[in-house]
């Protein structure tokens, strides 16, 4: 048994070298919808490089609806998405968190004097909303929040991209309800304030999930998910 220990240790070292060599030769492809690409992914990729040194990571940023087909074609190894409203039997989803929402306010807007806002504060305020076709989660959330408050949103403009929405806020076209991580997009004069419900709790109704092809096996993806699960609370702030 004593003689076998060096052999076992050598075998483990060889296995590690083979695994690391394979990682160095492979490109690991992560898809992320824009909010996750802005807030969650940078620190995750940084830490993943420490777990798997030498691995080349390719980040593909796109809308959730466009990322899911790329999983099925093999163009992506994993994706961080808003889970779809229709079943996807070929894709495995693991819920990560419900992202909070914030209100983006134009330069000098009186509501910026508040530390936090309720939907009622946005009554009659011109609103920029996402396109319902390309961003159904965000659009439906905005409309539902006003409906629950028995209010009709004053829609001034629709736009698809978060950057465009925030730029329009900066141009004083209106305010916008956006995901928390969008607040990391810096546009001159735009102020972000947390959106809370009547109980004073953050409005957290934008789900975020990890997705991959159901039944597939990938040790790098497993390593990434282990890291993500262990640091999710840290990454979410």
Where are these regions (language model features)?
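A late-sequence structural motif
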Residues: 40, 183, 191-237
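Secondary-structure junction motif
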Residues: 127-149, 218-226, 235-236
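Flexible hinge/capping segments at coil-to-helix
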Residues: 22, 90-101, 105-127, 222
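Short beta-strand->loop
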Residues: 92-102, 177-183, 187-204
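Hydrophobic hinge/microswitch elements
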Residues: 63-68, 72-76, 132-193
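Short loop->beta-strand "edge-of-pocket" segments that line small-molecule binding or catalytic clefts
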Residues: 29-31, 101, 117-137, 232-233
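Central regulatory/effector-binding core of bacterial HTH transcription factors
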Residues: 24-87, 159
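Alpha-helical "hinge/linker" immediately C-terminal to small N-terminal DNA-binding modules
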Residues: 1-20
